[in-house]
């Protein structure tokens, strides 16, 4: 067994993870003649329902604010036992019950429950991530935080410090990691690692940073992969943009000290209308694009071992990126196509690494031209590599990297990415297709130096003086790790903060 326990924190993270779990559910096979390429025990846990029937549910811990779960109930059909009547002797007076009007399940959920043809999902009828979820969750997976309300205008959950303070308060009362996470970890025979979905441009970045710091006390050597999601900026005020920038700076600096690998993901600000038909105001749409990349990049960690597929593990993937031991931050790119042999001009290419400020494609191209690659992981799903893909330093499966050398690991799988009825139709070139060919590239390279230094400079003028030195030093140390030929005695480091 090589189990992965997943942590989901926040609304956009839960949208993204819902797409992830829908994809995992689609890989189940129900015929003895049909063998799955996926080892379902990696992400799913066996159990017993209230009626004694066997269940197989996601091994995940989910957090969201009050109102964030939509119509999803903590007790579902698999665990719904008859409630016992309360002993009347406890209270002899008259009882008054106040109930909030329950949220009506989406038409899609109602059709799934009825076993009928699924209703069509649109941006207008997907109100919550639970509206398009195709899986059941264990009651212990669902944790609602009542101190803040989703989309509140009076007290929005939007500052990094609010997240750290909320975690500190709740942890004093309950010991969150022990209450919520440990039961899932203790079920594992040989835990492969922890996968974290979180936003990094709001208060969830602070909450997650504190949560992982607590986890590190109990799991000091466990591999932790953190997917740091960022919401589209859209038409928000300058003050809100600056707040998100500061949150991102704090989150990256803190998460990189607690995680084995941190991968920030944000949609490019450039127009993608020629290849992607997307409503950026819809988290159902934006999360779908990021989920496809995450699900593909981590595919080797759940492939069936011993099959013709190239199985990997989270620690091997992390080791291939963090070549020098101090490079936890990685960038992510994705290429999606209708067919295996699709030419380059028909592929949909997305660069998710948008840390700091808006970068033009021309500027990114200049950085990429001169970059030195420390580690790179290419994951192909029924897609032929293009001729210019990096071959230098390529490692065969199972081969260990050598410190100081460029490392390139490639994984190939015939398993295409499923385009389910719960997945939005955002790829015009794939209209009518039930699946897609895909490639992701995870990379640690020298272009990250300038990105982090820019983030450091821009955030320094926006944070209080008492935070500036620690944040600046942390980001400077992180940037230096990606400078080709850097050594601890270098005098090139700037000390302007």
From Swiss-Prot:
InterPro entries: Beta-tubulin_BS (IPR013838), DML1/Misato (IPR049942), DML1/Misato_tubulin (IPR029209), Misato_II_tubulin-like (IPR019605), Tubulin/FtsZ_GTPase_sf (IPR036525). Its main location: mitochondrion. SUPFAM superfamilies: Tubulin nucleotide-binding domain-like. GO terms for biological process: mitochondrion organization. Belongs to the misato family. One of its GO terms (cellular component) is mitochondrion. Keywords: Mitochondrion. The keyword Mitochondrion applies. It comes from Gibberella zeae (strain ATCC MYA-4620 / CBS 123657 / FGSC 9075 / NRRL 31084 / PH-1). Involved in the partitioning of the mitochondrial organelle and mitochondrial DNA (mtDNA) inheritance. This is Protein DML1. It comes from the Eukaryota. It is found in: Mitochondrion. CDD domains: misato. The lineage of its organism: Eukaryota, Fungi, Dikarya, Ascomycota, Pezizomycotina.
